A protein has these predicted regions:
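Acidic donor-binding loop of glycosyltransferase active sites
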Residues: 275-290, 301-304
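A charged, aromatic-enriched C-terminal amphipathic alpha-helix characteristic of glycosyltransferases
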Residues: 84, 339-371
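Donor nucleotide-sugar binding/catalytic pocket of nucleotide-sugar-dependent glycosyltransferases
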Residues: 149-199
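N-terminal subdomain of nucleotide-sugar transferases
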Residues: 1-60, 95
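Short hydrophobic beta-strand element within catalytic cores of glycosyltransferases
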Residues: 294-297, 304-308
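Membrane-proximal helix-turn-helix segments that form the acceptor-binding/catalytic region
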Residues: 88-94, 129-132, 140-169
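Conserved catalytic-core segment of nucleotide-activated headgroup transferases in glycan assembly
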Residues: 189-255, 262-276
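Active-site proximal beta-strand in glycosyltransferases
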Residues: 100, 117-137
Length: 372
């Protein structure tokens, strides 16, 4: 059987795979490489270092500088797209006729490149981007950033029709698949790729609730504030909040002596221990689009998982989580769950259900059929 080659164009350098978007990019490319696909990885770089790990894993790795000039903000096309045009990338892609997998709307400018007409070009959609940016605008307090997010959202909504030029769209959630299928042909749901090999949850009980996330992101810091001020304000149950770069306004909430603890900038090992030993991992979001990969982390490694319904949207994980959409329901569910043991039966249920949808081995076989 002849060698199979695939170009993957990534919006960022996907290693270390330590935030939502690049987790799917890296583990998808790794799964393909382990199946013998020769991966030609093309990365736009901005504030991340070149990676020997990637260069050792894949057939070839190329890097391209993002054009982050403020002039890009005044173009009619979205900044996340216009800052990722590269003539060097086009010339590299023209050296052969291998199929091209474009990661996100961010890299979809290549769909408009006439020199690539006739090439198989597939887009992996990571979000419904205009909805994502609109939600970023809603929770942003800085006026300049708020204007930028609203403006980018409007541009993304207009620009999205470029996806009609792709050969196929690979959605990351069922919710996104439903949306894109209403507007475009050839849409397939391919679940997120991830690092988790097995369900590693502990039986028994923990003695705290954990919320974790990148706390420099306004949506996450707002969720943490909501939990402190509205859910745990009168609960006699400990809350730990862990994550990157918590803003001063959030830090100040943890100086009042309540049974709450802020753990800033935990390393991966410390965060994994916090997830594993919590009795409840709680996750809330204002975004319905995409897939929240931290939800998979808590299901593979934690005990009870309490979420709002937006966290589950299109994930096919509803049966494995407890849902509460307001502060009163959350208080009620937390009190109830603290009287329950996490049992082996629950772990077995997770193994079965996660293995059906989020099995990297099965999903990479489907991906190879679609893409290569």
């Amino acid at each position: 059987m002849p060698e199979q080659h695939l170009h993957i164009v990534s919006f960022d350098i996907p290693f270390p795979a330590n935030y939502g978007g690049v987790i799917d990019v890296f583990y998808k490319a790794e799964a393909l490489a382990k199946k013998g696909i020769q991966i030609h990885l093309h990365c736009f770089e901005y504030n991340r270092e070149h990676s020997k790990e990637l260069e050792n894993l894949f057939f070839s790795v190329q890097y391209y500088k993002r054009n982050i000039s403020k002039k890009q903000l005044f173009k009619s096309i979205p900044y996340i797209v216009s800052s990722r045009f590269s003539e060097a990338l086009v010339l590299n892609l023209l050296k052969d006729d291998y199929p091209i997998l474009l990661e996100g709307l961010h890299t979809s400018g290549l769909l408009d490149e006439p020199r690539l007409n006739g090439r198989k070009r597939i887009v992996r959609t990571h979000n419904i981007e205009h909805e994502y940016y609109q939600n970023l605008a809603r929770v942003e307090n800085d006026l300049f950033k708020k204007y930028y997010f609203y403006n980018e959202s409007a541009k993304l909504k207009r620009y999205e029709k470029i996806l009609s030029k792709s050969d196929m769209l690979l959605s990351i959630s069922k919710n996104d698949e439903k949306y894109f299928s209403q507007h475009y042909n050839h849409v397939k749901f391919v679940p997120a790729f991830h690092p988790f090999k097995k369900v590693d949850s502990l039986i028994g009980k923990g003695d705290y609730v954990l919320y974790h996330g990148n706390l420099s992101v306004p949506e996450n810091s707002n969720a943490a504030k909501f939990l402190v001020n509205n859910v745990f304000n009168d609960l006699d149950i400990p809350l730990k909040v862990a994550g990157l770069n918590p803003p001063a306004q959030l830090r100040n909430l943890f100086n009042n002596g309540k049974d709450i603890e802020l753990i800033p900038n935990p390393d991966d090992k410390a965060l994994n221990e916090l997830i594993k030993h919590a009795h409840i991992n709680i996750s809330v979001t204002a975004q319905r689009t995409g897939l929240k990969l931290k939800l998979l982390n808590t299901l593979y490694n934690g005990r009870f998982c309490l979420v709002n319904d937006k966290m589950l949207s299109g994930s096919k994980l509803d049966d494995l989580c407890i849902v509460a959409n307001d502060q009163w329901k959350m208080k009620q569910k937390i009190k109830s769950l603290f009287n329950e043991e996490f049992t082996k039966n629950k772990i077995d249920d997770r193994k079965e259900k996660l293995g059906v949808v989020y099995n990297n081995g099965n999903n990479v076989d489907q991906l190879i059929e679609l893409v290569c």
